[in-house]
Amino acid sequence: MNIHEYQAKEILSKYNVPIQPGIAILKYEDIDYAIDSLATDTFVIKAQIHAGGRKIGGGIKISNDKNEAKNLAKNMWGMNLVTPQTGPKGQKVQRIYIESAAKIKLELYLGAVIDRSNHCITFMASSAGGINIEEVAHTNPDKIIKVKINILTGIQPFHSRKIIFQLGLTGDLAKQMAKIMSAVYSMLINTDATQVEINPLIITLDDKLIALDAKINFDDSALFRQPLIQGMRDEDEEDHLELRATKADLSYVRMNGNIGCMVNGAGLAMATMDIIKLYGAEPANFLDVGGSADKKRVAEALKIISSDQNVKGILINIFGGIMRCDIIAEGVLAAAKEINLSIPLVVRLAGTNFELGKEILSNSKLQIVAANDLDDAARKIVEAVS
């Protein structure tokens, strides 16, 4: 789960990470009051969307005049902000953060991530802050400092010293960085965050470290024990089909292809997407109905897939173990009849009660194409949408 910048800063400040004074505006009519309330000579007006690169699209403005700041915020509200991360469709601005401008001497980068490949938490830092860190990692990887931390021992002074030394920080700045790293580590562990980025982490003219921008991602599977974090969810920022799938307890990721996929098991789902690509087409989604799906969940899965206007055909690939193929067939029929499905549908069933499942589908009056195996299923659906 992603959250907005102002929410990330709110969390970080609770762990004593320094931030600039700011006010989040959640209603258009609160703009004037918020700007009047912020004691500063220079206002920074920031669009709040779940995407980076906001400045490029006009989502960050600076003003030394209070009235101008109000007009900038009002013009920003409701705009369709297009950035390199939103894609051409952009994202509608429905929240704004007004912040006091900082006097910057230097911009750094600091991040921490759950590093599954190395089974640890990895801190990353760079003197090239304020810009796209992925681009820095690609063009100048030597600029990225990495420190791996064993989750059993936690962050230790020598971890901080490595980053502090390589960044060239001394004296009070070194102490500040050590405190911020310790705070970020504690926050990541305590909130079930998977990624924390402070970019830039600035050094001010009076040698103070301040988190000028922040991004935090959280583990969706752990939200049940993080009610405060869950309360920060902004459903307007999420894909409506992915949100609908989450509420139905379905693992669904929307993609850019035109062949919808319904599969049980993540590994089988990825194999299904791979073979669709092998036949020259593109999957429209990843959807795992899980091993214990019932008729209702299967029906909802088909409705979600068919709600994507890019989908021109659907491939259902089920290997029945715990899940029975006849349950899948009944759910598919119920949903197909309810939504009056009119696009090609290819179904491959194998495993528990697959004969009964095939019989249920074949006895229906719907135009459903049966497949003998995965290769046959992929070939048939690609041919059907070509």
From Swiss-Prot:
EC identifiers of the protein: 6.2.1.5
Keywords: ATP-binding, Ligase, Magnesium, Metal-binding, Nucleotide-binding, Tricarboxylic acid cycle
Protein origin, superkingdom: Bacteria
Family: Belongs to the succinate/malate CoA ligase beta subunit family.
UniProt-listed NCBIfam families: PRK00696.1, sucCoAbeta
Catalytic activity: succinate + ATP + CoA = succinyl-CoA + ADP + phosphate; GTP + succinate + CoA = succinyl-CoA + GDP + phosphate
Pfam families referenced in this protein's UniProt entry, alphabetically: ATP-grasp_2 (PF08442), Ligase_CoA (PF00549)
PANTHER family according to UniProt: SUCCINATE--COA LIGASE [GDP-FORMING] SUBUNIT BETA, MITOCHONDRIAL, SUCCINYL-COA SYNTHETASE BETA CHAIN
Annotated residues for binding of Mg(2+): N199, D213
Subunit: Heterotetramer of two alpha and two beta subunits.
Residues bound to ATP: K46, E99, A102, E107
Protein name, UniProt field: Succinate--CoA ligase [ADP-forming] subunit beta
The record's free-text note on cofactor binding: Binds 1 Mg(2+) ion per subunit.
Annotated binding of substrate, by residue: N264, G321, I322, M323
Molecular function via GO: ATP binding; magnesium ion binding; succinate-CoA ligase (ADP-forming) activity; succinate-CoA ligase (GDP-forming) activity
Keyword DNA repair attached: no
TM region positions: none
Organism: Orientia tsutsugamushi (strain Boryong)
Job description of the protein: Succinyl-CoA synthetase functions in the citric acid cycle (TCA), coupling the hydrolysis of succinyl-CoA to the synthesis of either ATP or GTP and thus represents the only step of substrate-level phosphorylation in the TCA. The beta subunit provides nucleotide specificity of the enzyme and binds the substrate succinate, while the binding sites for coenzyme A and phosphate are found in the alpha subunit.
Pathway(s): Carbohydrate metabolism; tricarboxylic acid cycle; succinate from succinyl-CoA (ligase route): step 1/1
InterPro entries: ATP-grasp_succ-CoA_synth-type (IPR013650), ATP_grasp_subdomain_1 (IPR013815), Succ-CoA_synthase_bsu_CS (IPR017866), SUCC_ACL_C (IPR005811), Succ_CoA_ligase-like_bsu (IPR005809), Succinyl-CoA_synth-like (IPR016102)
Enzyme class: ligase
Cofactor list: Mg(2+)
Assigned GO CC terms: cytosol; succinate-CoA ligase complex
A GO BP entry: tricarboxylic acid cycle
